[in-house]
Every structure is written in C-alpha cells, then in structure tokens.
Amino acid sequence: MLSMFMCNNIVDYVDDIDNGIVQDIEDEASNNVDHDYVYPLPENMVYRFDKSTNILDYLSTERDHVMMAVRYYMSKQRLDDLYRQLPTKTRSYIDIINIYCDKVSNDYNRDMNIMYDMASTKSFTVYDINNEVNTILMDNKGLGVRLATISFITELGRRCMNPVETIKMFTLLSHTICDDYFVDYITDISPPDNTIPNTSTREYLKLIGITAIMFATYKTLKYMIG
C-alpha cells in the first residue's frame, strides 16, 4: 500500500512539473511576442496559397504545364538530333529560312500594331479602309504586311456586325491584297504545277489568294451569325 501511494505521488509530482513548464513557456511567449506579427515568407518561395485555392485544381494545372514542357523538350531534342545529322548545305538553307521567317514574323507583328493603333484612333468606312490598306501596301513590298493586313481585316470583320458591309470590305480588299507582290511570294514558295500553262499561272495564283481571303470572309460571317 505504501509503495502504491508513493508511486501515485511521484506521478502527480511529474505532471505538476510538466504543467508548470508548459505554463511558463506560454507566459513567456505571451509577454514577448506580438500576436499580430506576420512572419516574412522566404524570398525563394514559389507556391503561396490562400484559403480560396483549390489545391487539386492547382496541382492538375501544374501537371499539365509540366507535361507540355516535357513534350516540348523531347521534341526539341529530336529536332536538334536531326539538325546535327543534316548535311552542311542543308543546314545553311535552314538558317536562311529561319532568317526569312523571323523577318516576316517581325514585319507582321510591327504592321499589326500599326494597324490596330490606326483603327483605335479613327473611324473608317469600307472605302476608307481599302484606301488605307492600299497605301500601306504600296509603301511596303514585304510579305509580313500582307499577312498582317489579312489578319487585320478579319478582326475588323468580326467587329463590324453588318454582314453586307463585311462582304463588301472583303471583296474590295481581296483584290487589293492579292497584288503582284503577293503573287510573287506565293510563286516563290509554291511547287511548280506543270498542268497549268505559264501564261495563266499568275492569274491562277491570284485567284487562289482571293479565294483564301473570301474563305476568311465566310469564317468571319459564320462567327458573326453564331
């Protein structure tokens, strides 16, 4: 009985010590710590969440981004391997094509910005647009500006909710854009077709260009009608 009593006292004593230590720690913390203080996050922390974040959706999106990055990397590795296996002459032509495509892309982006600035500051009729585009094409012989013009009038067609005016605009501009310079670019990048007489090749290619722009008209009208 005595030993049991002593054991119980020892246990109670140890519990009292533990409780006292915990209370001392809490008192010390309450005296020295500002409870409103927000600890700074590490500068290199990438992921920061709030209570509204759906972690599962976030991780799913991250997985998609990672997979796309992996696919891009693998494709690039295969292309790099193929490029290294090509003859020197072939690689030199690829370099020339890259330079040309970069120039077309830069011209396209620059001319698109010019056209959007023009459209945002002025109000045009169909004939005004045709005259403006014709002036731009006369001052610039590049392919980039012609591609930019096609994109521009397609965007304008979507903003104009009058189908009749849209058709009129595309009809006028299809002939304006498909000029001799446009046909020359198509001729340079198209394989020769021996079934077409040389005398009618240019007319044929011009017709192809007009048809392509009219197809853009159809897609625009379909977008407008819904």
Curated annotation (Swiss-Prot):
Keywords: Early protein, Host cytoplasm, Host membrane, Host mitochondrion, Host mitochondrion outer membrane, Host-virus interaction, Inhibition of host apoptosis by viral BCL2-like protein, Membrane, Modulation of host cell apoptosis by virus. Transmembrane segments: none annotated. Residues 32-37 are annotated as: Essential and sufficient to inhibit host NLRP1. Disulfide bonds: none annotated. GO terms for cellular component: host cell mitochondrial outer membrane; host cell mitochondrion; membrane; mitochondrion. Gene3D superfamilies: Blc2-like. The keyword Membrane applies. GO terms for biological process: negative regulation of interleukin-1 production; regulation of apoptotic process; symbiont-mediated suppression of host apoptosis. It comes from the Viruses. It is found in: Host mitochondrion outer membrane; Host cytoplasm. One of its GO terms (molecular function) is protein sequestering activity. Induction: Expressed in the early phase of the viral replicative cycle. Plays a role in evading host innate immune response by inhibiting host inflammasome activation. Interacts with and inhibits NLR-mediated interleukin-1 beta/IL1B production in infected cells. At the host mitochondria outer membrane, interacts with the BH3 domain of host BAK and prevents BAK from binding active BAX. In turn, host apoptosis is inhibited. Belongs to the orthopoxvirus OPG045 family. Homodimer. Interacts with host pro-apoptotic protein BCL2L11 (via BH3 domain). Interacts with host NLRP1. Interacts with host BAK. This is Apoptosis regulator OPG045. It comes from Vaccinia virus (strain Western Reserve).
